[in-house]
């Protein structure tokens, strides 16, 4: 699945950039072989968020972690969103709650952003590490995605060790995700 998406990215980059996108012809050129991957995955995440698919995935992960670890829903939602989207976009999934968060929750959000990499960058790493070999790309994709997902509960543990919860979180035990619809259609996403 993931490797097939990388192949789509390379086919699209070859269509746009021609031989510049093929490392076997002219060697490795970062701008033509890595950046299209990042752009493609950022666009894919935008479309998945527009369709509501990513919200369901993030909400499910956040619900499970909130029940097991007994932390607030807002911080868990942001940390789980960080697995798929970047450090700057993840807190936007809980924007209405940020002003009323405790210091421990805010630190958790910051650590969550730094503990994960955005999906587009993860795809770029898979492409660079795996070279052109689909088997190697699948190997690295599996391990990098697993590490990124495991970092979500680890983020919560480290954050709570550094700054234990002393206040009463507004969303303790509840997972709510209110993402404003900023796109009109899939093209806009």
Listing of model-derived features with the role each one plays in the protein:
Residues 8, 12, 41-45, 50, ...:
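Alpha-helical transmembrane segments of polytopic integral membrane proteins
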Residues 149-188:
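Long, contiguous bundles of hydrophobic transmembrane helices that form the permeation core
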Residues 1-37:
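Interfacial loop/helix-cap signal at membrane boundaries in integral membrane proteins
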Residues 3-7, 56-70, 82, 96-99, ...:
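Short amphipathic alpha-helical coupling elements at transmembrane boundaries
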Residues 29-51, 67-87:
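Hydrophobic alpha-helical transmembrane segments of multi-pass integral membrane proteins
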Residues 38-42, 140-158:
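Alpha-helical transmembrane segments
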Residues 16-26, 65-66, 90-100, 180-188:
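Cytosolic juxtamembrane amphipathic/interface segments immediately preceding
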Residues 68-129:
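Alpha-helical membrane segments and immediately flanking helix-loop junctions
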């Amino acid at each position: 699945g993931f490797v097939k998406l990388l192949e789509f990215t390379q086919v699209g980059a070859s269509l746009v950039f021609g031989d510049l996108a093929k490392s076997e012809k002219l060697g490795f050129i970062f701008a033509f072989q890595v950046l299209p991957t990042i752009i493609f995955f950022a666009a894919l995440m935008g479309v998945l968020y527009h369709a509501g698919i990513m919200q369901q995935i993030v909400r499910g992960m956040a619900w499970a972690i909130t029940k097991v670890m007994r932390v607030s829903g807002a911080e868990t939602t942001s940390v789980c969103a960080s697995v798929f989207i970047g450090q700057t976009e993840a807190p936007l999934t809980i924007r209405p709650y940020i002003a009323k968060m405790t210091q421990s929750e805010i630190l958790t959000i910051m650590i969550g952003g730094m503990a994960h990499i955005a999906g587009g960058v993860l795809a770029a790493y898979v492409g660079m590490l795996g070279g052109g070999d689909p088997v190697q790309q699948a190997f690295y994709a599996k391990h990098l995605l697993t590490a990124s997902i495991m970092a979500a509960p680890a983020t919560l543990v480290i954050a709570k060790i550094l700054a234990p919860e002393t206040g009463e979180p507004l969303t303790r035990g509840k997972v709510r995700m209110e993402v404003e619809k900023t796109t009109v259609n899939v093209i806009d996403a």
